[in-house]
Every structure is written in C-alpha cells, then in structure tokens.
C-alpha cells in the first residue's frame, strides 16, 4: 500500500504542438463538432492520466469484511482491488457499494448485531452476493487509450477501472470518470471547441428530469440505503417537508458509518446522521438546466466533484410532484457490473 496522496495535475505536460494539429478541422476534414474529443482520447494512453504519486490499497480475499471497510475509510479510498492468493490473480473490486449492500441485506434492528459484517471474510461475501456467477475482473492496460477506458466504464456500467500492468500483473492505478475528465480538461483549451459545449443541459438532454431519486430528511438511514440499492445512484438530494433541497446524502456518507461504528443503528434519521458527518462538507453544489455544458464541466473540475448535482430553480409545490426546474445530473454511470465485487 502506497501511503502518499494523489498528486494533482497542475500544469500541461510538455508536448509537441504537432500533437494538436491532426485534430484541427481542416486536417481531418470535419467540423469541430465531429469526433474531436473522441480522437483526442484515442491519441492518449491510460498511462498518461496516471498521477506520479497516488494511494492504492489492495485486499486479500481472506481479510474480514469489517477490517477491509475500516481500512478503506482510514486511507480515504472508495474502492480496492481484491487479490486471491490461491489463484494468484486479482479477482474483483471491493467498493462502497458492497458495504451498502451488506448493511441493507443483513440489518434487522439496533438490538441485533450484523454478524455478516463483523465476521465474514471478503471471499464469503463474494460467494453470497455473486452466488457462483463470478465474472472476470474488468481491467485495462496502461498502454490502452483513454477512449478504450471511457468505453469500458460506460459499457460495463462501472465507476472504477483498474489499470493493470500486463507484464508484472500489478495494479498501477484505479482510473475513474473524474480523473479522465480532469486530465482531458487540461487540454480542452488547446482543441477546437464543439458547438455542443455551448448548448444547455436541457438542450442536450443531460440529467434526470422525471422520477428523481431523493430522500426526506426525516427518513431513516436504512431507507436511504434501500434507495441506493434500488436506484443505483451515487447520491441522494435530501429534502425537507416543503420539498426543498437542504443537503446531499452520498454513498461516501454510508461508508463513514463504519468509521463511526454507527452501522448497528440504521434507524436514525438522515438529518441526525448528517449532523454527525465528520468530514468537511460545503453547501450542495448546484447546476441549472439553462447552464451550458462548458460551464458545468468547469464547475465540476474546479470543485473536484463527480456526483449528482441538485438543481432547484424553484421550490417544489408538493413532495409528490417535482417542479420542472429541478434536475438531477448524473455524471457517472450507474454502479453495477464489477463495480461491486465482480
């Protein structure tokens, strides 16, 4: 386990200016809108987006589930590759999704200890959760293109993609949507800007405009976990009795239950749980349906977030019917596939 924190990319690497020439419209015979960003991604390898220093935690499948999640919290990571010593290979990923699934599946009441969390090993949970349907870990080579990485993330509906050296078999990094977006943003100003970057979220159809997944502040943590499991979203807007967004409850808040040893009582309200939030949290980052994609990407990169952003342009009239001005932007694919154990 490497203990140093991830080093941010602060400046453009020294690149030959000819790198960008082949992306100019007159060179490729297309309008700036056509495939500019795709071609850029195809020209860069996953290795290019790997920071010079990062933190990586790897778990053996014989480790107890509880210890694994506590280690994730202590090291500030949201996922870890799983190593099977018998097979001598990486077999999956342990993520916050697994913690949520365990709590939601086995929790009964504050009076009953969650035996499965306290005593099960990772390999036991994998057998219960996957029920024998083990799939090969989705990974990528450092020499593969960023386009391949993006395609794999979308195609497999995962949030994290292990970059594995094909020679040594070592995991070099966990590539995410956030990291790729941050890397791409560094070069965006050097490329012709497609017209869709000037279009609004509404025009592009980005976001969820109906049946937005949310949770009331008086609802229990267990109910929130149920929504995470059913809807497979990254975060839930928290609303008061007037339907106004007052906070955000994320999957990372759920993993913090392990740090606080609070997972044995999931009947507490979301409001009370958020008051115990130990990590720094600013106001809910918002965006609006009338804002352009360019503006939103700038905001996401600036604030270093990549999760649903609540967009209340007007307060809701009732809790049952969401106001058309409210949008939930999902900037990442839904968490399924090998995002959870596979």
Task: For every predicted segment, state its role.
Residues 1-342:
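Tandem CBS (Cystathionine beta-synthase) repeat/Bateman regulatory domains
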């Amino acid at each position: 386990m490497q203990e140093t924190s991830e080093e941010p990319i602060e400046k453009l690497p020294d690149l030959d200016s000819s790198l960008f020439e082949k992306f100019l419209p007159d060179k490729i015979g297309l309008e700036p809108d056509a495939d500019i960003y795709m071609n850029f991604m195809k020209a860069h390898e996953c290795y290019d987006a790997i920071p010079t220093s990062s933190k990586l935690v790897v778990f053996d499948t014989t480790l107890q589930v509880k210890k694994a999640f506590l280690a994730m919290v202590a090291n500030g990571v949201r996922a870890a590759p799983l190593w099977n010593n018998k097979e001598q290979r990486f077999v999956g990923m342990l993520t916050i999704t697994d913690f949520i699934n365990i709590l939601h599946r086995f929790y009964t009441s504050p009076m009953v200890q969650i035996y499965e969390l306290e005593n099960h090993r990772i390999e036991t949970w994998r057998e219960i959760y996957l029920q024998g349907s083990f799939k090969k870990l989705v990974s990528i080579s450092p020499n593969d293109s960023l386009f391949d990485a993006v395609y794999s993330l979308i195609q497999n509906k995962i949030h994290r993609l292990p970059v594995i050296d094909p020679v040594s078999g070592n995991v070099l990094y966990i590539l995410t949507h956030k990291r790729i977006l941050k890397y791409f943003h560094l070069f965006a100003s050097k490329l012709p800007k497609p017209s869709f970057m000037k279009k609004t979220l509404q025009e592009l159809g980005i976001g969820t405009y109906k049946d937005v997944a949310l949770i009331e502040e008086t609802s229990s943590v267990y109910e929130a976990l149920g929504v995470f499991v059913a809807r497979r979203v990254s975060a839930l807007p928290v609303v008061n009795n007037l339907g106004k967004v007052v906070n955000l409850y994320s999957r990372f808040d759920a993993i913090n239950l392990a740090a606080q040893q609070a997972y044995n009582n999931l009947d507490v309200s979301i409001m009370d749980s958020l008051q115990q939030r130990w990590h720094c949290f600013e106001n809910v980052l918002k965006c609006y349906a009338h804002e352009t994609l360019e503006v939103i990407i700038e905001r996401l990169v600036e604030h270093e977030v990549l999760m649903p952003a609540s967009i209340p342009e007007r307060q809701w009239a009732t809790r049952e019917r969401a106001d058309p001005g409210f949008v939930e932007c999902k900037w990442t694919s839904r968490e399924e596939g090998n995002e959870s154990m596979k």
